[in-house]
Amino acid sequence: GDRKTKTHSFTCAPWQAPTRSDNCEQCSDLAPDGTCYESLCRSLGKNCELINGEDPIFAECISGSINDVAPPKITPWAELIQGQTDKFGVSYSYDVVSGNPGGYVINPDIDSLIPFNFGVQTNEPAQCRYDTELNTSGYYEMTHEFDQGSLLVKDHNFTLILPGNQDYDFYVRCVDFYDNGENDPPFLIKFSTKDEPDRQPPIILSTDPLSGSSVAYDINQTPVI
């Protein structure tokens, strides 16, 4: 019979990541050990950005855009707040506060001198800070970090032990990978602490030197701070 010949040519070239990818979030699933890393994230799309790369537990590949100008949306962390109870077993709740600034108020009054965990959530990975006074200087001038520090995450919390018979306003700002939200109006966490006698014994939070630490040779005692 008739014989036909076809010639195919192949060239090896560097991988070109797709211009726009919806697969950035698959990075951890594709990584051999489940930990996303920079080169793998970048290979999934030109719009893919690795965040929290210094911490393998929180490393994440997100779909970014230089045209993203939307600030993180801040909401109460409902499960965290409502999962706590006062010393009488009453569950805490919150009411949304509208206006400027908007936020939430915690009910009932918080127990004094007992740790309370405050929290907010964001609709995208972000980092958050708070102040006890309203300032207009922006995110990076705020004093207090949440427990997550500079990590870009969606769940944010911090724990405080506060004196009784006080009213508090905490002003929160959060920024995303592109610093959106830096100068936005803050989110308000409003609450009061119970007016009650202080019957709580002191709690030792830390010591220096730490328990079990080594001391210099031939030293039998050392000051404890």
Regions found by a protein language model. Name each.
Residues 1-127, 138-163, 169-180, 185-187, ...:
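Extracellular/cell-surface secretome signature
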Residues 130-132:
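Conserved aromatic beta-strand anchor motif in extracellular beta-sandwich/beta-rich domains
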